[in-house]
Amino acid sequence: MGVACYARLTGDESCTAQAKTMAAHLLEKIGDKGNTPLTLDGQGWSMKYNLLWDKVLHLGLLPDSFYAAETASYLPRINTYGLPLDSRADYTKSDWICWTARMADDPAVRAALIAPVAKELHETTSRVPFSDWYDTKTTRLVAFIGRSVQGGLFALML
């Protein structure tokens, strides 16, 4: 992603081609059927929130079919209060859920990802400014209080 962004900023077409080649190699390893692994050895899973910028900046690194399959693969993993960051724990980051929702073109997938974040905000027992890092099963605050990263909640407006 970073290589493609710098290539665009500098107008370096060879660097753009290199970024697209790297993305193509990645797709060869992981496929475009969704459910990409947490690590390249195929273990676990994770939200691919940083891929948001491929969609927002129209870099064209990965096909729309990849994003549709990947975001749909998250739906069965959503807990009461949101999608965990990855398969290692039940905590999440609300801003990154919104980044992930922005990658989905399907409004139903977006809504399914966003609704639990709103539910957490309404039902949390934590009496602090909106924490971006919380447990998706209990709403328990993990850390981080009232941080500016919550601007990521507006990712759907990009």
Sequence positions of predicted segments:
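A structural signal for conserved, well-ordered secondary-structure elements
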Residues: 1
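Inter-helical turn/loop segments and adjacent helix faces that build the functional surface
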Residues: 4-17
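Non-catalytic carbohydrate-binding regions of carbohydrate-active enzymes
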Residues: 14-50, 57-158
